[in-house]
């Protein structure tokens, strides 16, 4: 657990629906200002072994999961679970058979992997798992996504020189075609794992985007935030 002591930026704000806002664009614009650019981003073309910068990486498929070897150290995904809820309230088993992408952050001594299952069918094609690997401590942190994108990103939200990760939880579509996605802040610990970033009062930091199917109707959009700073500066 990571504790933020004496934080003065906590805001709980729900938008006013009297005026239209494209909250998806507001979120994207905000996140772009906080992104940490990777030293290298590699999209795997099917290879099982490759060298990226000075790092040697290989992987193989197992009966349940994959085994990744990073500079001689083995990382086995079998039996691992996500830190975040992926769909609704439950964590997910890391069910993968393919290494899709590698992101290297040299200054942060981190690697980020996007892991998938191929060939996929139905809802399984909307799922991916993300592994953060600390090159110094060899610690692993797992997250999952469903219908919330395949991109891997690290951020600097707190100006504390500790990289952050933003988990995404999809809460499903209601009868009116309205979706809810919750974003939760995780930050790197001194041990190399990523854990929820919390206030001195043990409150986590999050924001929710509530939107209609395919973002077609802005009248149904809402944005709720309890974050370290105000994201929706329009105030509506």
Predicted regions, residues:
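Repeated scaffold domains used in trafficking and secretory/extracellular systems
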Residues: 96-100, 148-155, 205-209
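Surface-exposed loop/turn elements that mediate protein-protein interactions on large endomembrane-trafficking
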Residues: 67-88, 129-145, 186-198
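C-terminal motif of bacterial Sec signal peptides marking the signal peptidase cleavage site
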Residues: 5-6
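Acidic, small-residue rich beta-repeat scaffolds with periodic aromatic anchors
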Residues: 9-65, 162-236
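Long, charged/polar, surface-exposed segments that mediate recognition or autoinhibition
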Residues: 108-118, 123-143
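Short N-terminal edge-element motif at the start of the domain
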Residues: 77-109, 120, 134
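Short helix-loop boundary/capping segments
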Residues: 134-160, 166, 175, 179-180
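Acidic, glycine-anchored loop motifs typical of Ca2+
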Residues: 46, 50, 105-113, 156-166
């Amino acid at each position: 657990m990571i504790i933020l002591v004496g934080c003065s930026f906590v805001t709980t704000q729900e938008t006013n629906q009297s005026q239209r806002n494209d909250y998806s664009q507001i979120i994207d614009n905000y996140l772009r200002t906080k992104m940490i650019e990777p030293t290298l981003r590699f999209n795997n073309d099917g290879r099982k072994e490759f060298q990226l910068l000075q790092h040697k990486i290989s992987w193989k498929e197992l009966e349940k999961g994959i085994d990744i070897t990073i500079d001689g150290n083995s990382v086995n995904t079998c039996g691992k679970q996500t830190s975040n809820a992926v769909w609704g309230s439950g964590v997910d088993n890391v069910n993968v058979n393919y290494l899709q992408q590698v992101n290297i952050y040299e200054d942060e001594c981190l690697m980020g992997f996007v892991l998938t299952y191929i060939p996929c069918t139905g809802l399984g094609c909307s799922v991916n798992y993300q592994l953060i690997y600390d090159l110094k401590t060899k610690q692993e942190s797992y997250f999952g996504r469903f219908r919330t994108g395949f991109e891997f990103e690290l951020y600097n939200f707190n100006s504390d020189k500790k990289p952050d990760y933003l988990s995404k939880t999809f809460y499903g579509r209601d009868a009116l075609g309205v979706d809810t996605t919750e974003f939760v802040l995780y930050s790197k610990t001194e041990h190399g794992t990523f854990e929820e970033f919390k206030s001195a009062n043990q409150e986590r930091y999050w924001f929710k985007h509530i939107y209609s199917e395919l973002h077609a109707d802005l009248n149904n959009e809402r944005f709720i935030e309890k974050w370290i700073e105000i994201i929706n500066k329009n105030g509506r």
